[in-house]
Regions:
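Beta-propeller blade termini and top-face loops
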Residues: 1-179
Length: 179
């Protein structure tokens, strides 16, 4: 079982996991194909706007898995979430880190929004660190315009950042705390 006390927090549990409904939530099926075994915690999924068969997921798995088994990190599905392929070991924290976004126009662009912000431009074959600097501390959230993938916002510790050129340059709005 997981520990929850004022000075400690462990997310997830044995009954957690990824569940799918295709009847408006009347029935649910637990999805396990390709996912880490054992308990799971925080999960974030992004579905491609023009092809809902393509999904990417940030998945928090049991921290005691053997090193050679897929665990916490990034997964991708090409069949509407019925099965998943492990792409990248990456820390997915249970609080505000671990959001994932798939570019609404180009599904090869995957953004893992966290303290260690990672980007793939080849459908998850490789990942690298973000190519821009936002001077905002930890990244918490991201939005990409569905009609123009060059327009994006990032929410950080200090406020928000707007780019209209795909992340080459950023306009900072440091007047709000986000996270």
């Amino acid at each position: 079982h997981r520990l929850r006390q004022p000075a400690s927090f462990e997310s997830g549990g044995e009954k957690g996991g990824l569940f799918k409904s295709i009847d408006g939530g009347i029935t649910w099926k637990k999805i396990t194909n390709g996912l880490a075994k054992g308990s799971s915690g925080m999960i974030d999924i992004s579905i491609h706007l023009n092809n809902p068969d393509i999904m990417v997921m940030a998945y928090e798995a049991d921290e005691n898995l053997p090193e050679d088994e897929p665990g916490t990190g990034v997964y991708i599905s090409y069949d509407s979430g019925e099965s998943w392929k492990f792409l990248l070991k990456h820390a997915v924290r249970p609080f505000y880190h671990g959001q994932i976004e798939i570019d609404p126009i180009n599904p090869n662009n995957i953004y893992v929004v966290s303290r260690g912000f990672m980007i793939s431009n080849d459908g998850g074959k490789t990942f690298g660190p973000r190519r821009w600097r936002t001077d905002g501390g930890d990244d918490h959230d991201m939005w990409i315009a569905p009609y123009d993938n060059k327009i994006m916002y990032i929410a950080t510790d200090q406020g928000s950042r707007l780019s209209i050129d795909g992340g080459s340059t950023w306009l900072s709005h440091n007047n709000m705390a986000i996270g």
